[in-house]
Amino acid sequence: VNELFRWYETTALPIYNPGEAARGVKGKIPSNVADSPLCHLSVSKWCFENKIEATSKERSERCGRLTADVCKKAVEILNRKIEEGNAFKCAYPMQKSVSYCGECHLTKGNEANWGKGIMDCTPCHSGGPAVSDKFKDHP
């Protein structure tokens, strides 16, 4: 799952183009890098960057194509794990924010060990225009 999340966070999606078989919007649609595996962040960022309404056919088509991309990548990762066994190494390193924040929030025995998960912390906690700055005045 970690490998799939990192790929999703850093890859311009959607990639898949069903051509004339598309049920919604035919042809190429815009792609973007989500920076998060969370659906609401991913789709909202895509809509914002491309000036496309969340209720549009283009948005629905994007989600369908993205689902195909994710399924394909998941199978590729599973096949690699089967082929490589214990030698399997993730292609995507842990994000700096996870390492940094995890020193306190993901370390057993620490007072602040209440974090769970290894998603990139910055999309939700970077202090951007739409999110609170959890890094300000913080160790």
Question: Which residue ranges define each predicted feature?
Answer:
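Amphipathic alpha-helical interface segments
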Residues: 3-78, 85-92, 99-100
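Hydrophobic alpha-helical segments
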Residues: 73, 77-81, 107, 127
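Solvent-exposed alpha-helices and their adjacent loops that cap or buttress functional pockets
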Residues: 93-95, 113-115
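The canonical Cys-X-X-Cys-His
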Residues: 100-108, 118-127
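Long, repeat-rich segments with strong aromatic
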Residues: 108-114, 132
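Short metal-binding segments enriched for Cys and/or His
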Residues: 129-138
